[in-house]
A protein has these predicted regions:
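N-terminal ligand-binding/catalytic initiation module
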Residues: 2-180, 405-406, 410, 414
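Adenosine-phosphate binding glycine-rich loop
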Residues: 23, 183-184, 205, 308-417
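Solvent-exposed alpha-helices and their adjacent loops that cap or buttress functional pockets
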Residues: 79-85, 121-122, 147-149, 173-174, ...
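Short, ordered loop/turn segments at secondary-structure junctions
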Residues: 94-96, 104, 133-134, 159-162, ...
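Glycine-rich phosphate/diphosphate-binding loop of Rossmann-like nucleotide-binding domains
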Residues: 99, 104-124, 182, 186-284, ...
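General beta-strand structural signal in soluble alpha/beta enzymes
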Residues: 130, 156-159, 180-183, 214, ...
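Rossmann-like adenosine-cofactor binding region
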Residues: 257-327, 332-334
Length: 418
């Protein structure tokens, strides 16, 4: 099992390359600090104890290790007990949708994957390994991840563009007996649902009573639609650049929620985004910055809830959000109500690994959303506090416990662990 170094050692005389920055981004001093934090990479592998004698060497490598190898060959489940497999997650990307920057390729994605690995270790005690694949072919990605899967207890897919991500995740989960999660989809959806539970409490409404507009029907948007429908949302409208492309009878949408990528009318909009906003109570943006205006908000019902999650510029600027919305949230850490999938995936994988879960199912996601919402106590729930902070020490243990219990309740744990 590896450990990840959480300290960053900078040389006394730091000489960093000059990097041209687009206008309006970080100052030179901030850029220097950023590159200094990344110098030499942000993670490392270290042994759990020193190899400081011939006797220790013979235990951890030959000849002693041969006994462990034979034990695993006779009973593969032993790998979870005598190797780091049961505490290891592969963080896999093809670099096709890196952050909000687009298709940068696998090498440029590596710093982001290292950051994920640090967060896994710090927040959940999980050893996570960045795997940046030099292919964007779904078949090759599935073959490669399947081939390396014996080393890991879980697969975390990251920054893979839609619609390929849906097929890749499904095929990997079908092929493997360990949990697979595309975080851009399900991590986002879980935290959005948790925040919405509490925002609705603030406004005195119920999920089955409100009209919800999801703007942006990529990986995150479709997963949000699916989980909202599973949670009991009744009136749901989906928009992309073309306009209103997802609407229909509530029961029909709910039954077909797993098929949403196939039934969205991307090329045949039935209205505009403004049409979708008429009378809506909730706007969930997972799209692009500055697409909402005060005039748009006037089309919504009173006390609108707006989750403007585009980064770095939200769909509605904060100064307008606080003025015109009853509840306003972003994906940014410099404003209240940060909706961040960091609240979901460390605890979900911790619970999945601890319970021996073979998948992350819808029941787990719904349970985690409820648990996250309940971590905001009634006495502190307000327009400006609808979701726990990402460093709240209660989050990961509560989420892990919920996932472990849901795995047992739904019968998706490895044989012998029920």
């Amino acid at each position: 099992m590896s450990v990840i170094d959480k300290t960053i050692e900078e040389p006394a005389n730091t000489s960093l390359p000059h990097v041209e920055q687009p206008e309006g981004t970080c100052s030179p001093s901030a850029t220097d600090r950023i590159f200094g934090a990344h110098r030499g990479g942000k993670i490392r592998v270290a042994g759990k104890f020193p190899i400081d004698s011939p006797e220790t060497l013979s235990l951890v490598y030959t000849p002693g290790v041969s006994h462990v190898c034979r034990a695993i060959a006779a009973d593969p489940a032993q790998a979870y007990r005598v190797t780091g497999k049961g505490n290891s997650v592969a963080v896999v990307t093809d670099g096709s949708a890196v952050l909000g920057l687009g298709n940068l390729g696998p090498q440029a994605a590596l710093p982001a994957m290292e950051g994920k690995a640090m967060l896994f270790r710090q927040l959940a005690g999980i050893d996570a390994w960045p795997i940046c694949l030099n292919t964007q072919d779904p078949d090759e990605i599935v073959r490669t991840v399947t081939a390396i899967a014996p080393s890991f207890g879980g697969i975390h897919l990251e920054d893979i563009s839609a619609p390929r991500c849906f097929d890749i995740e499904r095929r990997l989960q079908d092929a493997l007996n360990i949990p697979v999660m595309h975080d851009d989809q399900h991590g986002t959806a879980v935290v959005v649902l948790a925040a919405l539970h509490n925002a609705l409490k603030v406004t005195g409404r119920r999920l089955d009573q409100v009209t919800i507009v999801v703007n942006g029907l990529g990986a995150a948007g479709i997963a949000c639609c699916q989980l909202l429908l599973a949670a009991g949302a009744t009136y749901l409208r989906g928009c992309d650049r073309q306009g209103l492309v997802l609407t229909g009878r509530p029961q029909s949408l709910r039954r077909a929620r797993q098929l949403l990528p196939d039934i969205i009318q991307y090329d045949r909009p039935v209205g505009t985004r403004r049409d979708a906003l008429k009378g809506a109570h909730v706007f969930i943006g997972v799209s692009a910055g500055n697409v909402l205006t005060p005039d748009d908000l006037k089309l919504m019902d009173h006390d609108p809830i707006v989750f403007a999650l585009a980064n770095p510029d939200p769909e509605l600027p904060p100064e307008l959000g606080y003025r015109y919305c009853r509840v306003y949230a972003t994906g940014r850490s410099d404003h209240p109500n940060q909706i961040n999938n960091l609240l979901a995936y460390p605890g979900m994988f911790r619970g999945g690994l601890d319970s021996g879960a073979t998948t992350f199912n819808e029941s787990m996601q719904l349970t985690v959303a409820s648990v996250l919402a309940d971590l905001v106590p009634a006495h502190s729930l307000s327009e400006h506090h609808i979701i726990p902070g990402v460093f709240d020490p209660h989050v990961v243990p509560a989420v892990a416990k919920a996932v472990s219990q849901a795995a047992r309740d739904t019968g998706v744990v490895r044989c012998g662990l029920r």
